[in-house]
Structure formats: C-alpha cells, structure tokens
Regions:
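A structural motif corresponding to the C-terminal end of an alpha-helix
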Residues: 195-201, 258-269, 337-340, 364-375
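Conserved Radical SAM active-site core
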Residues: 80-116, 120-231, 235-243, 251-264
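Conserved strand-turn element in the central/C-terminal portion of the radical SAM core barrel
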Residues: 205, 237-239, 245-248, 261-282, ...
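Active-site glycine- and acidic-residue-rich loops that bind
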Residues: 210-213, 277-286
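Glycine-enriched alpha-helix->loop->beta-strand junction motifs that scaffold or abut catalytic
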Residues: 224-227, 268, 294-298
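Short terminal hydrophobic/aromatic SLiMs and anchors at protein ends
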Residues: 1-4, 8, 12-19, 23-26, ...
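Short beta-strands and strand-loop turn motifs
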Residues: 5, 171-174, 270-274
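Auxiliary Fe-S-binding modules of radical SAM enzymes
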Residues: 32-89, 93, 99-100, 283-399
Length: 399
C-alpha cells in the first residue's frame, strides 16, 4: 500500500509545497511514492513577475546590505503567478521636518519632504538611493514601501515659531513628490501648505501630480501675496515612453493641462524639462518648452539625467529591457558628460554634465527660451510678510 504525503496528492496536480526540492524528493522516497509521477510546484517570489505597473524591474539590495539576494532557476516550474506588488504605507514621527543644505548649485537652502519613497515610480529618480538609509531597496521598495509623516504640519509650525528661525523660501518636492497618489488619502502636503500660508512664508513646489489642482484655493491666495511658485516636470511628450519610465505619473498632456490650470489661477509656473535623456528624450526639448509656454508657463529649466549610486544599474536594466538598441549609445553619452563615469556628483557638474554634448543641449535650451520668451530665473517671492506661528498655549506678542 502506498501512502501519499498530505501536501502532495496525485489527484491534485496543482498542489504545491513551499520547501526545497531535495527535501521533497527525500519525502516522496520515504513514503514510497514514485517521484516521477508527481509535479510539485515551488512557490518563488520573483520580482520580475510582480513589478507590473512599476518603474524599477528589480529590488536589488542597497549599498549598505552585507548580503546580496539573487534568484536561481532550480528547474522547477515557478508555479502560479503571484499578485502584483501593492503599495504599503507606514508612519514616521519626525523630530524635525525642515532639512537644510549648503549646495551652491541649488536655488534654495532648505526643503521639506512629507513622504519617503514615491509611488510615481520614475525609474530615473535621483532620490532612490535615499531609501537605503531606511534599510530598504532603492529599487521596487522605493515605490512600494512608502513612509508618511502625518505630524509634519505640527512639526513645521513648531520650527517656524522658533526664535532663531530666519525666513527664506522653502522647497517642497525636492526628494519625493508631495502630490504622489497617497497624498489623496493623507493630505499632509495640503496641511503643510496651510501652515506656510497662515505664516506668510514663501514656498517653491516641484511636482508631476494632478492632485496639486486640489490646492489651487490655497496656492492662488499665496500667489496674490507673492509667496509661491510651482515647477511642473515634463520629461517627454511621448505617452508610451512616459508610461514605461514613469508608470504612475499623469500622462504628458495631462501635466501640460496642470500648467494651464495653475496659470489661469494666477500661480507662477515653471516648465521643467527634466531629466533629459540623451538619444531618447532630449530631441523633444524644444517641443516640451513650447508646450509649456503655450499652456501659460512663465519660466523654464532643464536637467540632464543623473545616475547616482543604485540608480545607474536600475536605469541600465530598464534600458536593456525596453530600448536595447539605444542602451549603449545613451550610456556612452552620459559617460562622455561625466568624465568616463556613469555620474559625477561634484557641484556644478552633477546637474548638466560637461563636454560637447552637454553644451549642445544647453545651447539649444538658451535659444529656445529666448525665442519663446520664457524666463530662466524663478519668479521672486516675498519674505517680508512672514509672521511666526503662535503655538497653542504660547503667549502672544504685544507688538
């Protein structure tokens, strides 16, 4: 009489075990079950099968991990398809929310980011390496394992009320998009904007998200007081290319419409042609600027593709998957602009690179903005209207 192990039944061809193949063989031999008669499927979590609708194709470990995880084909069928990765949001209570920098090539010295990670999933995002500080992967983790900071408005109010605080424009969206999809549920960006508006504090916002239209009531009021300007990033006008490299970002035409609606509300808008990818999206530079101008943008800027740390292998993996015929040429152009390396992090070099190709793109930009009548300097914002917030329980000033 033959005994069939409980988890492997001849009548259930689709059954599977989550064990090692060698252990399955020993188990079947011990129960005198001919191994060749049964198909045992191994459940294996492969990111390639689960990354549909995401920018990154893998979830490689970060530079701080001591061990590297790799997939190996053991000859078994991969089993039933696992569901696509879902976005997970956890909560962080920050001690501070304003981050200061001394970078000479940035037009601001402070910023706030109310989320860590970004569901937009732009494969080229230079902020991906920041997820490594959290013990997470700059790959798929960056766009699926997000962190919200719901106490950010209260912390911001406290920092603005500090006696030693000196007012200067704050940037929002420098690391992750403040209007990414999870903002619809959490509303942290809107609450922070209200704090800034009440205090008369200037703010510059960078986004790709349509959700900014929800806050036109606050933004238009701040614009009338000279307290806000907005940058809308448009990487390409090609909808197919956009879906591939920034899968959860509004389509290019929709982003141009955001510019139009903000401009109609009297909000100063900049069209940001960034990042420009050589031999892929940079031929569209003039068309992007023209579309932004037609929609009401007052100013324009551009940045070349940046590949810091873990971003380089992610982008190269993406190029090999979607544009194998251009991958070599694109990487050659980037290395040409960064002294033979994938990326040069030096101030003044990192944003646009150097060399003939970088200068050619810069010259095209200068000619285009002059022809279109676009400014390159941002709209000036006022700092003289700032009044420190009065915290609950604090004594109000008599003067």
């Amino acid at each position: 009489m033959r005994h069939t192990p409980r988890d492997v039944r001849p009548e259930s061809y689709e059954s599977h075990l989550i064990v090692r193949p060698d252990r399955v063989k020993r188990l079947l031999r011990w129960h005198n079950v001919p191994f060749m008669f049964y198909h045992v499927r191994m459940t294996r979590q492969t990111y390639a099968m689960r990354a549909l609708g995401r920018g990154a194709a893998s979830n490689a470990v970060s530079r701080y991990d001591r061990l590297t995880r790799t997939e190996e084909d053991d000859g078994w069928d991969a089993g039933e398809a696992l569901p696509p990765l879902r976005t997970e949001v956890s909560v962080e209570v920050p001690r501070s929310i304003i981050t200061y920098n001394k970078s000479p090539d940035l037009p601001f010295d402070r910023s706030i980011n109310v989320y860590r990670g970004c569901e937009h999933g732009c494969v080229y995002c230079f902020a991906r390496p920041s997820h490594a500080y959290l013990g997470l992967s700059p790959g798929l983790d960056f766009e699926t394992r997000l962190i919200a900071r719901p106490d950010a408005p209260q912390v911001l109010q406290r920092e603005l009320a500090a006696r030693r605080y000196a007012v200067a424009p704050i940037a929002m969206g420098t690391n992750t998009d403040p209007y990414q999809p999870i903002e619809r549920e959490h509303g942290i960006t809107r609450a922070c904007l209200q704090v800034l508006s009440d205090a008369g504090h200037p703010v510059a916002i960078v986004t790709k998200g349509t959700l900014i239209e929800r806050d036109i009531d606050i933004l238009s009021d701040m614009a009338r007081r000279g307290l806000v300007r907005v940058g809308i990033s448009v990487t390409t006008l090609d909808a197919r290319l956009s879906r591939l490299m920034e899968p959860r970002v509004p389509a290019p035409k929709r982003r141009i419409e955001i510019i139009r609606r903000l401009a109609q509300a009297g909000i100063p808008v900049r069209v940001m042609a960034s990042p420009m990818i050589p031999a892929l999206s940079d031929p569209e530079l003039e068309a992007i600027l023209a579309a932004g101008k037609d929609a009401g943008a007052r100013s324009a800027s551009w940045i070349m593709l940046r590949l810091p740390r873990e971003v380089s292998p992610l982008v190269q993996e993406w190029l090999a998957q979607h544009y194998p015929d251009r991958a070599g040429r694109i990487m050659a152009r980037l290395r040409e602009m960064h002294g033979g390396a994938d990326y040069d992090s030096r101030w003044g070099q990192r944003m646009r690179g150097t060399g003939p190709y970088a200068e050619m793109v810069a010259q095209r930009f200068r000619v285009a903005v002059k022809r279109l009548g676009l400014q390159t300097a941002g709209t000036p914002m006022r700092c003289d209207l700032f009044r420190p917030p009065v915290l609950p329980g604090a004594q109000m000033s008599l003067f």
